């Protein structure tokens, strides 16, 4: 690698690093704006313990943690939806929603749309309740582990190893 290539690579790394730092700095600034608006640094906020942090500590595996995180993200989206008309904190909420979109949904618009559809479903609607109960068996089947299918496939070929030896 010649000197010019080295300088260009170094500049690219510096630019990418500083833009990431800038994005994180903007994100933290917006969280601080929300904390100030809600007076979230007040000592009485800690009364009764944390809202989410203790629950997150109890879940260790990534797949399990994703379940809890989805509920927490759902809470924040509902919170931001309730405050959508508040112009004082709108920019902060938009910045944080964008960061949630990138981190939780991997920038997938379709995942975000599906998630938002789910959190908007009215639980008290009788028609929705009937549909949900109608779909319950399929949902439960989708939740069950697929390991039984793999075991069944393996047990169907008992002579597979013997043929290779002959």
UniProtKB/Swiss-Prot annotation:
The protein's recorded glycosylation sites are 39, 106
Q: Where is this region: Disordered?
A: 147-166
Recorded hits in Pfam families, A to Z, give: IFN-gamma
Biological-process GO terms, alphabetical: adaptive immune response; astrocyte activation; cell surface receptor signaling pathway via STAT; defense response to virus; extrinsic apoptotic signaling pathway; Fc-gamma receptor signaling pathway involved in phagocytosis; humoral immune response; macrophage activation involved in immune response
Check the UniProt entry and state the signal peptide residues, or none.
1-23
* One annotated Gene Ontology cellular component of this protein: extracellular space
Entry's localization field: Secreted
The free-text tissue note of the record is: Released primarily from activated T lymphocytes.
Which molecular-function annotations from GO does this UniProt entry contain?
A: cytokine activity; type II interferon receptor binding
> Which of UniProt's keywords are assigned here?
Antiviral defense, Cytokine, Glycoprotein, Growth regulation, Pyrrolidone carboxylic acid, Secreted, Signal
Which positions does the record annotate as the modified residue Pyrrolidone carboxylic acid?
Answer: 24
Chief site of localization = secreted
Q: What does this protein do?
A: Type II interferon produced by immune cells such as T-cells and NK cells that plays crucial roles in antimicrobial, antiviral, and antitumor responses by activating effector immune cells and enhancing antigen presentation. Primarily signals through the JAK-STAT pathway after interaction with its receptor IFNGR1 to affect gene regulation. Upon IFNG binding, IFNGR1 intracellular domain opens out to allow association of downstream signaling components JAK2, JAK1 and STAT1, leading to STAT1 activation, nuclear translocation and transcription of IFNG-regulated genes.
Question: To which protein family does this belong?
Answer: Belongs to the type II (or gamma) interferon family.
- Subunit field text: Homodimer. Interacts with IFNGR1 (via extracellular domain); this interaction promotes IFNGR1 dimerization.
Protein name listed in UniProt: Interferon gamma
Q: Which organism is it from?
A: Equus asinus
């Amino acid at each position: 690698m010649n000197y010019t290539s080295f300088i260009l690579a170094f500049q690219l790394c510096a630019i990418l690093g500083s833009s990431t730092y800038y994005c994180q700095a903007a994100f933290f600034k917006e969280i601080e704006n929300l904390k100030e608006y809600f007076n979230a640094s007040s000592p009485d906020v800690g009364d009764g313990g944390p809202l989410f942090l203790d629950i997150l500590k109890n879940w260790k595996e990534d797949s399990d943690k994703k379940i809890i995180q989805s509920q927490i993200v759902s809470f924040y989206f509902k919170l931001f939806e309730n405050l959508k008309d508040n112009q004082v904190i709108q920019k902060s909420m938009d910045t944080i929603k964008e960061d949630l979109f990138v981190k939780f949904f991997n920038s997938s618009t379709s995942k975000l749309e599906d998630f938002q559809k789910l959190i908007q479903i009215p639980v008290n609607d009788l028609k929705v309740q009937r549909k949900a109960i109608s779909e319950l068996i399929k949902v439960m089947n989708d939740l069950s582990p697929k390991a039984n299918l793999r075991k069944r496939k393996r047990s169907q070929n008992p002579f597979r190893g013997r043929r290779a030896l002959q």
